[in-house]
């Protein structure tokens, strides 16, 4: 949930700003000087909204807009084509997202929750891996509070790049550019450009399209550049960090099951999960997925060692149907099952580390027939979704983790980048990588959402200009053309509102 302290700071801060603004504007002594100061600095204040506009950057915008005229013409032509395609594609994307949300709501409904625990676990796991392209983000709920800096920085940069696109395109089409500004609405930052509306209305629909599509076009290009930077990050950081030999532990949560004297520590290099080699973050995630979805793997043990370590036990069934044969309070012993030479399933309680250390993994006794001595494949008898995982992090002794693989995934932070020198921070590549991922996601989302033909978004003006450019010669009656545009806008607005409303409900009500 959203921390109460954060809400108090935000509401309290805005209340103080608004009251101070109200008092100064009401004061006989400060009213005129305060309003002159606001006007001089391009500031305007209203409840939960601060806006700053300046003409300082006008010279730079005009310089960019008049440089390489032919290249800019082609650049914004590409943007116009992209914008029109994105506008119509957004209907399909929003429709698909809405269907996914409805399907997820039906899957989570009480009527569907009567299925077995294994099938519900499978469906919840699959939903993790089939995430929607568009998803509502609520700080403190599905956006970690400790990543708000990345989020808002990426939002601001995406907004600035978006508006720079509009500004340069407008100057290229001979529309007067009045200024550039930044605003803060509650906690969300953004940017805007001030264009001379009369000039904008006098140019042709195609010219208008180039201007209106420029913002989402620049966001799309920024997202592509972010993807390129993410792919090339190992090469960019190669002089300082190397990759491909394992994953480095950067943080272990205080409540993580991996904490302990023989657990994982910051700076450990993990090379294997069970028999699954780990060379990067993707390998780590794939190995954990495989371990979670496949049956518990076994370990080969010789008959003599098994006889030496085992002792008489009384097995009993747990509530989930699995078998337990050790003391519930034991921190070192684990119940194992195996088949003897007569193919009879037996259970024995063994000290876990001695049983699985320096042994090969197996599925059946046949996998252990590598020597003349008799061997058995012993499999940990654990609760349904619990796994025993041997984590190799040399030179330390292997960690034996018992729990759900997802708990290891969510409570241990890792990176593929290993510093070449001791003075280098292990967090720097993570910071860069995380920020670039946010920039890709938010810039791409800004391009998609703004392309939707919806009231008050770029999509509204893109649609109007597109209809003016294509239907004016076909439909002589402007009222009919406007009616067509209105119904398309209405459909896009309803579709977007439905996605946002249901998305918020899914995020906050679950």
Curated annotation (Swiss-Prot):
Location relative to the cell: Membrane; Cytoplasm; Golgi apparatus membrane
Listed EC numbers: 3.4.24.85
Organism superkingdom: Eukaryota
GO BP field: bone maturation; cholesterol metabolic process; membrane protein intracellular domain proteolysis; mitotic G2 DNA damage checkpoint signaling; positive regulation of cholesterol biosynthetic process; positive regulation of transcription by RNA polymerase II; protein maturation; regulation of response to endoplasmic reticulum stress
Reactions mediated catalytically: Cleaves several transcription factors that are type-2 transmembrane proteins within membrane-spanning domains. Known substrates include sterol regulatory element-binding protein (SREBP) -1, SREBP-2 and forms of the transcriptional activator ATF6. SREBP-2 is cleaved at the site 477-DRSRILL-|-CVLTFLCLSFNPLTSLLQWGGA-505. The residues Asn-Pro, 11 residues distal to the site of cleavage in the membrane-spanning domain, are important for cleavage by S2P endopeptidase. Replacement of either of these residues does not prevent cleavage, but there is no cleavage if both of these residues are replaced
Membrane topology qualifier: Multi-pass membrane protein
GO molecular function, one term: metal ion binding
Family matches, as CDD domains: cpPDZ_MBTPS2-like, S2P-M50_PDZ_SREBP
Glycan attachment positions: 328
Cytoplasmic membrane side: 1-3, 505-510
Key words, A-Z: Cholesterol metabolism, Cytoplasm, Glycoprotein, Golgi apparatus, Hydrolase, Lipid metabolism, Membrane, Metal-binding, Metalloprotease, Protease, Steroid metabolism, Sterol metabolism, Transmembrane, Transmembrane helix, Zinc
Its job: Zinc metalloprotease that mediates intramembrane proteolysis of proteins such as ATF6, ATF6B, SREBF1/SREBP1 and SREBF2/SREBP2. Catalyzes the second step in the proteolytic activation of the sterol regulatory element-binding proteins (SREBPs) SREBF1/SREBP1 and SREBF2/SREBP2: cleaves SREBPs within the first transmembrane segment, thereby releasing the N-terminal segment with a portion of the transmembrane segment attached. Mature N-terminal SREBP fragments shuttle to the nucleus and activate gene transcription.
The protein's name: Membrane-bound transcription factor site-2 protease
């Amino acid at each position: 949930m959203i921390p109460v302290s954060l809400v108090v700071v935000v509401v309290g801060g805005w209340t103080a700003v608004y009251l101070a603004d109200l008092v100064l504007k009401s004061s006989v002594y400060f009213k005129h000087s305060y309003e002159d100061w606001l006007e001089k600095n391009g500031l305007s204040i209203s409840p939960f909204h601060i806006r700053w506009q300046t003409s300082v950057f006008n010279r730079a915008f005009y310089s960019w807009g008049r440089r390489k005229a032919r290249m800019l013409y082609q650049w914004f032509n590409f943007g116009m084509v992209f914008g029109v395609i994105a506008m119509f594609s957004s209907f399909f994307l929003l429709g698909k997202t809405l269907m996914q949300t409805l399907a997820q709501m039906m899957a989570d409904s009480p009527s569907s929750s009567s299925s077995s625990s294994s099938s519900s676990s499978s469906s919840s796991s699959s939903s993790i891996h089939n995430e929607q392209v568009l998803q509502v983000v609520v700080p403190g709920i599905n956006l970690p509070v400790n990543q708000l800096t990345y989020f808002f920085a990426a939002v601001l940069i995406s907004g600035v790049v978006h508006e720079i696109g509009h500004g340069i395109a407008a100057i290229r089409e001979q529309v007067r550019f009045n200024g550039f500004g930044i605003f803060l609405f509650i906690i969300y930052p953004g940017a805007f450009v001030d264009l001379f509306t009369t000039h904008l209305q006098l140019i042709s629909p195609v010219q208008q399209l180039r201007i209106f599509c420029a913002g989402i076009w620049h966001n799309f290009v920024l997202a592509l550049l972010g993807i390129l930077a993410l792919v090339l990050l190992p090469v960019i950081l190669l002089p300082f960090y190397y990759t491909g030999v394992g994953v480095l532990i950067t943080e272990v949560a205080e409540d993580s099951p991996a904490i302990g004297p023989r657990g994982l520590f910051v700076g450990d290099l993990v090379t294997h999960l069970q028999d699954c080699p780990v060379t990067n973050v993707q390998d780590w995630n794939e190995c954990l997925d495989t371990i979670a979805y496949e049956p518990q793997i076994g370990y080969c043990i010789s008959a003599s060692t098994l006889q030496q370590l085992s002792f008489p036990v009384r097995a009993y069934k747990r509530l989930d149907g699995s078998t337990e044969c050790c003391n519930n309070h034991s921190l070192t012993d684990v119940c194992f099952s195996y088949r003897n030479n007569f193919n009879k399933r037996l259970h024995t309680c063994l000290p876990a580390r001695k049983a699985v250390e320096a042994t090969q993994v197996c599925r059946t006794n046949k996998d252990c027939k590598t020597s003349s001595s008799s061997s058995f494949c012993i499999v940990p008898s654990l609760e349904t979704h619990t796994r025993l995982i041997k984590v190799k992090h040399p030179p330390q002794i292997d960690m034996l983790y018992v729990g759900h693989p997802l708990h290891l995934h969510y409570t241990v932070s890792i990176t593929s980048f290993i510093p070449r020198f001791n003075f280098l921070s292990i967090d720097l590549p993570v910071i860069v990588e995380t920020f670039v991922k946010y920039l890709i996601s938010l810039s791409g989302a800004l391009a998609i959402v703004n392309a939707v033909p919806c009231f008050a978004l770029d999509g509204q003006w893109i649609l109007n200009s597109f209809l003016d450019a294509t239907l004016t010669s076909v439909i002589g009656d402007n009222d009919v053309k406007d009616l067509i545009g209105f119904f398309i806008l209405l459909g896009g607005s309803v579709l977007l509102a439905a996605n946002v409303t249901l998305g918020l409900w899914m995020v906050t009500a679950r």
